[in-house]
Amino acid sequence: FSTNKSLITVPQKQDTKFTVSETEKDVKITTSEITAAVSLTTGEIVFTDKTGKVILNEDNGGKTFKAIEVEGTKGYEIRQVFQSPNDEAFYGLGQHQADEFNYKGRNEELFQYNTKVSVPFVISNKNYGILWDNYSLSRFGDSRGYANLDEAFKLVDKTGKAGGLTGTYIPSPRTNLKTIVRTEPNIYFEDLKTIKNLPKDFPLMGSNVTYEGTFEPQESGLFHFYLYYAGYMKVYINNELVVPERWRTAWNPNGYKFALELKKGTTIPLKIEWEPDGGDSYCGLRVLTPIAPEEQNKLAIFSEMGDEIDYYFIAGNNMDEVISGYRTITGKAPIMPKWAMGYWQSRERYKTQDEVVGTLREFRERQIPIDNIVQDWSYWPENAWGSHEFDLNRFPNPKKMVDDIHSMNAHLMISVWPKFYRTTEHFKEFDERGWMYQQAIKDSICDWTGPGYVGSFYDAYSEGAQKLFWQQLKDHLYHLGIDAWWMDASEPNVRDCTDMDYRKALCGPTALGPSTKYFNAYSLMNAKAIYEGLREEDPDTRVFQLTRSGFSGLQRYSTATWSG
């Protein structure tokens, strides 16, 4: 078994009494409430209550291991399957954007992205939960990734030609450019890499795009579709509107899922209408081919990389008791400051000190209740992201600003990113210790501020880097009297809209190992840095952090997560 310390769990204050018994068939571990019986033949574990009633059992062992090696680190692709009755429901998994609540029979990919928060915990209406102790990209349900349309169907364009769909690209009338018509073998333009496959030099802003033709399933069953969109999009299948118009801003696309029963060999019309939003925009339609319904409806979890299968079974008399068990394992949430429960005022940044203080003063003069005002990003000099310094041309006296806020009986929460421009002293402090992710620097990735500046994110998996991150905040912001900390982009989102392989390159390798293995827990480590720093500095003051990403255990750092 691995000797690595779990990032998710906390040490337990007391041991639970248990007994161990063995027969020719199994080994049983029994507590006062639960028995776990491990088959000596298959390794299958069956969990029963004290009356012998089965609560959960693995599916004939249900374990799959595939040996892999990533960046010199050995591990396994892993999957665990449990049996599940038809009337079971599953909830949890974090915060996803596809309008799903009960995950029974559904599929969900667990990775971190702006507005997508992945938590490897699922709770059942049968009053148990599974905490999956793994930090890599994971999948609930089907372990396969979504396939392109041409891998699952025979595609025919609107003229009857096999091999793809007809893509019609109508430019904005203001461009005086001609319409482009071409064959698309699949609809997969979902990131900065794949949008290069769109028509060259075609301006998406203000255009209208249509993909149409027919598709023929190569097998019968329930097909699960995944629509990826930025801008406005509709989908018609078999001449029926199956996805009414949806919209998403181009810099942060979204996914939507739907499923259809289809028959092998049938010819089915397909039409996708897309109005891109922005100069770069994204769209995609992919699919999972059918698996047997009894397989689709089981409880199954897959992870890209781990040392072993490691999960916690939590049982209770009701869901509250299961959640209590989850808190016991991952850490209890400290009581947050009372003021944090009050009214907040926030906007896409106040640009000056006068705006912040003046806005708060207006609330007080109008006798509108308010407890917290929020300073969003870009209060620093334009070329000094990560300096944690106010731009004195716009915020001439930050200490007075905070004091003025406090004098009006309010609090200030400030946005802090784990991002640093390479020209800042803070970047250099991390970099010289090997605590800065290097890929963005090597590729000279410029961000969207001003002319664009090159920078990267610090490695929050390093304990030394955590301490340095807090020390920099303490020296430059904490001493002003800041009341709360808004941890933005803590996925970490080094760059928007990159493909998954490049995302991993941008946020690794970590101090603990390859980013493939440690992909989802960055926000947990980042929150730990600030929480432990604050507790050491001022143990008698309650902590409040707001973070854009989350993971199991985040609550123990007095952290709330917002929708991004």
Q: What residue spans do the PLM features occupy?
A:
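Predominantly extracellular/luminal regions of secreted and cell-surface proteins
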Residues: 150-193, 316
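Extracellular beta-rich ligand/substrate-recognition surface
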Residues: 196-209, 244-253, 507-509, 513, ...
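Aromatic-lined ligand-binding clefts that engage carbohydrates, nucleic acids, or primary amines
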Residues: 215-235, 270
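Beta-strand-rich interaction surfaces with strong enrichment in secreted/lumenal proteins
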Residues: 17-18, 198-202, 212-215, 257-262
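N-terminal accessory segment at the very beginning of proteins
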Residues: 1-154, 159, 207-208, 222, ...
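Edge strands and adjacent loops of beta-rich recognition modules
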Residues: 94, 180-206, 328-330
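Aromatic- and carboxylate-enriched substrate-binding clefts and catalytic-loop regions
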Residues: 6-8, 57, 256-258, 369-564
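Short, acidic/polar
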Residues: 351-365, 465-475
